[in-house]
Amino acid sequence: MLFCFCFCGFKFEMNLNFCYDECNSKKGGTDMGKLLAKERQKEIVEYINSTGSAKIGDLADKFEVTKETIRRDLTHLQEIGAIERSHGGATLVSSFRPIPIETRVSENSSVKYALCEKGLELIPEQGVIYLDAGSTMQCMAQLLSQKSGYTIVTNAINTTYHLNNGNNVTILTGGQLNPNNMSTEGFQTTNFINTIKVDISFLGTSGFEQHNGPAVSEFTDAQIKQAIIPQSKIIVVISDSSKAHICSLVQYANWKDIDYFITDKELPSATYKTLSELTEVILV
């Protein structure tokens, strides 16, 4: 009876191992096949960035997982803006093309709220705040609407909808409407910004890979950001870590000009090390 129990136990253990290998690897459970999902997705982005595109079958072979697993990975990476799906695979994200604000608002919303909550800790009491245009700043506006006593300047029309619910002074800059992010821009906007001083500015980025600072996809957006930087005592850039894998069109500042960079803990360690030498990086 004892022998039979041990034998069955051995068989059961072997079957478990077999199932694990079948689910996680097509080649017998190598280290590549056992990568955690987040690690694999990070390497998928790096691979596509280096090659320009990749087929689902090739990725499945490379990472030793099923095609269905790769499809789920690519769906998630597309949702966070790290890659673009193509027929049978994926390509580099078209980061030079502006993405409508309605699309960006829902991406990584829980992460954005967590980052903005950390940003609230940097705001001086009764401070004057500048909020950039972008989906992350809408999260910040919703949090600020629960506070009172602040003066908030913004060029983002959608942001004012949220600020209207709070007990703060809200100032909207003038200028020409940019329908991509529902913000004002142009000479009137920069001219107004040049007349004010603020305690702290919160800025976003659509990607900073291959740049020495935060970057965006439109020159007019970069111009507004460049205008507010010298008018601010404190400059804070807030972005989720996926932007580390996206190369946007135009850099608007150097990291050494940024006082704080708030991002999540999925930021690649090499990127964290590099940025930490130039600015204060806060991981949430």
Q: Predicted segments — roles?
A:
Residues E64, V93-S94, P179, E209:
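Short secondary-structure capping/turn micro-motifs that flank functional sites
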Residues G29, G33-E43, Y47-G57, K62, ...:
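HTH-adjacent hinge/linker in prokaryotic transcriptional regulators
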Residues L16, G28-L36, E46, S53-G57, ...:
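Conserved phosphate- and dinucleotide-binding cores of soluble alpha/beta proteins
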Residues C4-D31:
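Short, Lys/Arg-enriched N-terminal segments with co-localized hydrophobic residues
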Residues M137:
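Conserved SAM/SAH-binding loop
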Residues N15, C23-N24, T75, G134, ...:
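Intrinsically disordered, low-complexity regions of eukaryotic proteins
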